[in-house]
Amino acid sequence: MTTFEGSYDGTGMRVGIVCSRFNEFIVTALLDGAKRGLSSHGVSESSIDVVWVPGAFEIPIATKAMATSGRYDTLVTVGAVIRGETAHFEYVAGPVADSIAQIQLETGMPIGFAVLTVENVEQAVERSGPGAGNKGEEAAIGAIEMANVLKALR
């Protein structure tokens, strides 16, 4: 029996990060976590590109452009969709997640998903803080692992 597992070594990897400007104070903290996760696993800062888009709804199109560019080994998506008093949350959160999953399947590009979908600002702050549990950091480390898993399988 052969077992495939990805390592957490990002040395030499090129990584693209797509960030939503909406709820920027949360997204910036998630981005800091993603960059921390990448650098602590061997990805050099000069090998990281960050693209800012207006809101979470625009994340998929920028992500697909990066996934098909041939420049990256893996990508990370970063955003924060916070439930409000309208149905906007439902129209954005699900389609963004579905689109990112579809981009992975269509392109073979592993994509770490750090687009928070939370009920309130307090939950967003809990998931984007500087300590353990920063979802940006977790997504970035997962993206490195998946890039290595897929490399081993190809």
Regions found by a protein language model. Name each.
Residues 24, 36-44, 64-71, 101-105, ...:
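Generic secondary-structure signature for well-ordered alpha-helical cores
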Residues 58-100:
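Glycine-rich phosphate-binding loop
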